[in-house]
Amino acid sequence: MPSVSRRDLISAGVAVGATACFPRQLLSFARSLPESAAPSLALSAGSWMQQVGKPPYSAGEEGAIINLAQSALVKLFDGKMLSDLQSDADHLGIPAAERVNITLRHAGRIRGSMSAPGKNLGTQVIESVFRAAMDRRYGGPLARWEASGTSLEVWLQVGSSEIDHDARFEKSVLLLGVEGLEIDDHGQSAYYKPSVAITSRYKTDVTLFEALCKKAGLDKDAWKQPDVNVRRTQWLCLPSVSNAHFFGPQLSPVAKLPIPLDSSIAESAYYLIRNQNVSGGTAYLYDPIADSFVGKKTNSVRAAGCLFALSQTLQSNHDIADTETFKIRTAQMARGLLSRTSLTGEGGRVVQGEKTGTLPEEDERDDELPERAGKDAELAEEEESDGELAGVGATALLAAALSAGILRKEFAQEYQQLYRSITSAQKPDGRFITHFGETEESERAANYYSGQALLVLALEAERGNTKALEMCRRAFEPYVFHFKQAPTTAFVGWHVNVWSRIAILTGNHAYADFVFEQTDWLLQWQIKSHRDLRWVGGFSQSGGAPQFSSIVFLEATVRALLLAIRTGDAKRTKNYVDCVRSGLHFCRLLRLEETPSTLLGNPMRCKGGVALGLIDRRVRCDVVQHFITLCLAVEEIKKHLV
């Protein structure tokens, strides 16, 4: 009988999402397996080897297992002893599993996590429930007052395989968030469930290996020794609370688009509104596992970008755009940003106190993010010193946000002042300065500030401003040369947005050709196939896991697709359609709704949030911003995707 490959197991649902953090959907994999694997199933799962055409447990058995665990916890607090629960355990009638773990969480915080042996699965479950409830490692044993609000996860190990010595040193040997890890050195052993990569600071293979060695009482480099056994493990997780309880039903498998556009736009826009402070600004960096906001200074570029996304939403035909509360809160955000501006002697207005930190596309050092040293694994950003000259980026995005609709009506004078500053930032050669008051450009900032400044002019040109259009024309050749000399992903996101608009407005093929040149170059970094199917559709230059910057790159691809459709470029249209479909599947996995709700400290606060990566589930405000504008762009071409 043919066995099910690791790839088949993943494609069947174990890695079908960042819910892939938990292989919950393994339960339905028998219906999804490739034809080559359909006749049989061979999993290293204790006494139920080679189950033919069926998942490890039936739907009825799953329900009985989780019910037994929940009932055991209630009865133990009611004064029952484990011996009193044995008849219930035996009644389950399922043979012992290779390993059972019970994890208890309260408000997303782990309160206990233990395993226990047993003569059958029922005994393993009740014994593990007792041990988890008495676990002293996470704030002491579970107390009665918190029991009613405690979620429970039943983890069942359904497979394992040895990681050969040489393979341990390969890149991405583990499917992080999908597979667990086990180590054994002559009886000194320990294991991690798949969720550890999501909830801990150990977000790479190496850091997991080292931490697990320490847990087993071994030297942190013991995993490198050939006589030490290291195994990857596959698990099934049965949670007591489903995501649907907080986030509503999951997207139907037969849905025409991988992302529900209407609800995604509304929920992500409300995420920014819901997490505003009294000044109108939105939370910069949020950790949904700990339910805490990271205490960092805000970034003016990213704050203005969030307002731009909300402004674009207000100009759309979505129901949310007609909501009075949404209008008021968006205007409040605008006032907060304007309070951080100052007037110039030339009658302009600029945003002050801006950090020259990078935009999402600049942060893509694929392996650096999860491996960053330090307790909080903070994102690397350049801190702006006191008195540093104001950058063009935040001023440009604030101007773009105020350039139309109700915001332009309410802040007409402020917009004109901001616009004057942007027009004054263009140099005689057509390029833009990167910091007001300084003619020498910052090489890094030029890649994205120039596109943001040009976006303001492109939006004006679309409204019939011929002077703005002429300024775009003057900038065209210098920035074409800039890209050809040193192409970078940081440049493409904003410049494709700009020049696709100008190409459609003017019908000039030179602009269209430049858009297609950038997009074709960018798409070489899109992952077309990978053994970790979650990666497919994302973008990565170094071969590491794709990150949140994929959202920016996909929006550029969507805008290039719209241009290809308008210009009748059938070949590119077909290619871009396929790339956009694939990219949307990846971007969907970054939504916090794809994270098991039992891991989230406050699920309702998370609604609409978009994570930094498949494993790093923190939310930064500008990632939400780019997700909103991506969805708005997709709406323009969605009929070509279905």
Regions found by a protein language model. Give the residues of each.
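Extended, well-ordered alpha-helical scaffold segments
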Residues: 257-272, 320-340, 390, 409-425, ...
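Low-complexity, Ser/Thr/Pro/Gly-enriched N-terminal "stalk/linker" regions
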Residues: 246-301, 329-332, 336, 340-354, ...
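Solenoidal tandem-repeat scaffolds enriched in leucines and small polar residues
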Residues: 421, 425, 430-451, 455-464, ...
